[in-house]
Amino acid sequence: GVSGSCNIDVVCPEGNGHRDVIRSVAAYSKQGTMWCTGSLVNNSANDKKMYFLTANHCGMTTAAIASSMVVYWNYQNSTCRAPGSSSSGANGDGSLAQSQTGAVVRATNAASDFTLLELNTAANPAYNLFWAGWDRRDQNFAGATAIHHPNVAEKRISHSTVATEISGYNGATGTSHLHVFWQASGGVTEPGSSGSPIYSPEKRVLGQLHGGPSSCSATGADRSDYYGRVFTSWTGGGTSATRLSDWLDAAGTGAQFIDGLDSTGTPPV
C-alpha cells in the first residue's frame, strides 16, 4: 500500500520523543491480505505476555481468522521522507522480514471497538520490541500521538497538540471514544491505520483507532479521528471475553495506569 504524502515517517525528527513506543506498533495481515494496525501492550505483571490491541471492526474476532494473522514488526522507511513530497506519497523501502504468525482472541467488544489478541509466539529478541503502558483514567489529555500504518504501508507518526474530547463515535453522544484533532499541516490517519494506538503525553495507550473524517486533504474539524477508549474497554461488556481488565490486570492490582516495558525487561526511567 501507499499512504498519503502528508504522513510522517517514524524515523523523522517528529518521532524522537517516541522511539520506545514506536517499537510496539505493527501492521498485520488477515487471511493473507494486509489489513490493519495494532500494538503490543504491557500488563500489570510486567511479564511480556504478547497482548496485542487492535480494533474490533478489523474482524480479528474468530479463532480461525486470528490463527491466520501475520504481524509485521519494524516495518518503516529507513529515511525521513519530507512530508508532502512525492516520495512520501510513494512506496518506501520498509521491510516485512520481521514477522510472526498466529494469535488467539482474548477479548473483544464493539462498543469501544477493541479486540485484544495474544500472539502465539514470544517476542523474538532480534526485533527489539516494546510493550507500551496504558491509561484507563476517565479524563481528557492535553495532547496525543498516533503511531500507525496508513494503508498498511510503512509506519508513520501523527501528533495532536490540542486537548482530546470524550465523545461517542463519529460525533455521536456518548463517552466510549476520544476525539483527537490533528495538526493542520501534520500527519493524519488512513484506512489501514485502524486499530493503531493513541498515546497520552506520558506515552501510555489511551485507545485504538476506530475511524473518522481525517485525510491529508481534510481541514478544520474534519482533520480528526475517533479512538475507542481503554477506559470504556476496561469493563467492556462485563465478561472476561468482552473487557480488558482480566488480561491487562490479571492480578487485580487496580492500577489506573502502567508504564511500558522494554525488551530488556526493565521498566523505562
Curated annotation (Swiss-Prot):
Disulfide bonds listed in the record: C6-C216, C12-C80, C36-C58
Keywords: Disulfide bond, Hydrolase, Protease, Secreted, Serine protease
Residues making up the signal peptide according to the UniProt record: none
EC number: 3.4.21.50
Family membership noted in the UniProt record: Belongs to the peptidase S1 family.
Known function: Highly specific endopeptidase that hydrolyzes lysyl bonds including the Lys-Pro bond.
Protein's UniProt name: Lysyl endopeptidase
Species this protein is from: Lysobacter enzymogenes
